[in-house]
């Protein structure tokens, strides 16, 4: 059964810098909880044709990663995501080609937004996924997957704040 999750976060940083950070897959481990021990492997970048430079993962790029699924568990899983859509400084989308879910579609959206007179960027993550396994997957989603996803995206928001405040948003990897 298809599940939906949406996460929003406003950050006091320019749209172009935030998009550049998220558009570079080497930054993914910096956003993830340390216990996940995310390791990138077999990253194949297809630069967007209309951009002169940058480390953006355009349409057709693939990102392989291995990571721990739940805190305290010793085993790792791996996944491969393919970028299926990319519009510079607006959004990009990835789908799981290989991994733990029956289906996974993640849309990353970015929009300039002023709050309390401060220029910033609204980051929106929309995820549609199916854990598979029928009724067992539905129970697993309610007990483990959805709560862990909520915690992971909360961590991503805190990590992004820390990266911005430390002045390291424009550094990669």
Predicted regions: what is each one?
Residues 93-151:
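Beta-strand/loop substructures that line and gate deep hydrophobic ligand-binding cavities in soluble
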Residues 40-97, 158, 163, 167-171:
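Glycine-rich portal/gate segments that line the openings of hydrophobic small-molecule binding cavities
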Residues 17-22, 28, 63, 83, ...:
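Hydrophobic pocket/interface hotspot
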Residues 4-6, 76-80, 102-106:
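Short, surface-exposed coil-to-beta transition loops
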Residues 11-13, 67-71, 85-87, 100, ...:
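Beta-strand elements of well-folded, non-transmembrane domains
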Residues 151-159:
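A non-catalytic, amphipathic alpha-helix used as a structural packing/dimerization or gating element
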Residues 1-52:
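Hydrophobic ligand-binding cavity/cleft-lining segments
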């Amino acid at each position: 059964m298809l599940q939906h999750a949406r996460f929003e976060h406003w950050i006091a940083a320019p749209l172009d810098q935030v998009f550049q950070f998220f558009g570079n897959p080497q930054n993914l481990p910096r956003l993830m909880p340390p216990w996940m021990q995310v390791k990138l492997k077999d990253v194949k970048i297809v630069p967007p044709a209309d951009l002169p430079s940058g480390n953006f993962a355009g349409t057709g790029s693939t990102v392989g990663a291995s990571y721990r699924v739940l805190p305290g568990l010793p085993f790792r899983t791996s996944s491969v995501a393919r970028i299926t859509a990319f519009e510079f400084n607006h959004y990009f989308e990835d789908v799981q080609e290989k991994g733990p879910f029956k289906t996974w579609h993640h849309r990353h959206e970015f929009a300039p937004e002023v709050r309390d007179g401060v220029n910033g960027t609204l980051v929106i993550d929309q995820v549609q996924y199916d854990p598979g396994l029928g009724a067992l997957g539905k129970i697993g989603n309610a007990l483990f997957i959805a709560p862990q996803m909520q915690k992971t995206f909360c961590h991503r928001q805190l990590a992004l704040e820390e990266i911005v405040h430390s002045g390291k948003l424009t550094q990669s990897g």
